Amino acid sequence: MMAARRINSAGLVLIQSFEGLRLTAYRCPAGVWTIGYGHTGPDVNPGQRITPAEAEALLRGDLDRFESGVAAAVGNAPTTDNQFAAMVSLAFNIGLGAL
């Protein structure tokens, strides 16, 4: 069995730069409570604060779903690590269903 394909460090930095780091929860333009590098969900509450390390852990956890989804969509098609990272970044931004 092949190991799960993961985003490379350049892709991680790309997502972090696009999302920006917010250590205090805020409402995004869509009205959703958000923290860290674009993390949303029932675990984000008004006034919540996190550390940079916690923000990175949340992002890595969030990316699991997108890495798996992109890997499934790509299948055996040859892609470079940077191409895969770009697709994960896009999926993180617009959602897997929009790919």
Question: Where do the PLM segments sit?
Answer:
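Cell-wall polysaccharide-cleaving catalytic domain and substrate-binding groove, primarily
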Residues: M1-L99
